[in-house]
Amino acid sequence: MRAPEEVIIRPIITEKTNRLMEDLNKYVFEVHKDANKHEIKHAVEKLFGVKVKAVNTLYARPRVKRTITRRGRVYGATRGYKKAIITLDKNSKIDFMSL
């Protein structure tokens, strides 16, 4: 089993995830690509001291980007990563500003 600091890479904070945090008490994290739901749940409970109700995971695939420059078309790609959507117990809350 990995250390909790290795499992949770960073929180993903966007307008959509802020709405999820406020309305449904769900938090979104980028996690290690080989981490399973049990490791993710254990890591969140240990790092933030909260009670996790559910864990949903998904893989955000890499996207191809292209741009046209003086040298012609240039192709690149974003990296793929694994996301975890954590649903907390209704009495639990994570405050990212105090970290």
UniProtKB/Swiss-Prot annotation:
InterPro entries on file: Nucleotide-bd_a/b_plait_sf, Ribosomal_uL23-like, Ribosomal_uL23/eL15/eS24_sf
Pfam families: Ribosomal_L23
MF (Gene Ontology): rRNA binding; structural constituent of ribosome
Gene Ontology cellular component annotations, sorted alphabetically: ribonucleoprotein complex; ribosome
Transmembrane spans: none
Domain of life: Bacteria
Keywords: Ribonucleoprotein, Ribosomal protein, RNA-binding, rRNA-binding
Single Gene Ontology BP annotation: translation
Listed Gene3D superfamilies: 3.30.70.330
SUBUNIT field: Part of the 50S ribosomal subunit. Contacts protein L29, and trigger factor when it is bound to the ribosome.
NCBIfam families: PRK05738.2-4
PANTHER family (UniProt xref): 60S RIBOSOMAL PROTEIN L23A (PTHR11620)
Its job: One of the early assembly proteins it binds 23S rRNA. One of the proteins that surrounds the polypeptide exit tunnel on the outside of the ribosome. Forms the main docking site for trigger factor binding to the ribosome.
Family: Belongs to the universal ribosomal protein uL23 family.
Protein name in UniProt: Large ribosomal subunit protein uL23
Species this protein is from: Hydrogenobaculum sp. (strain Y04AAS1)
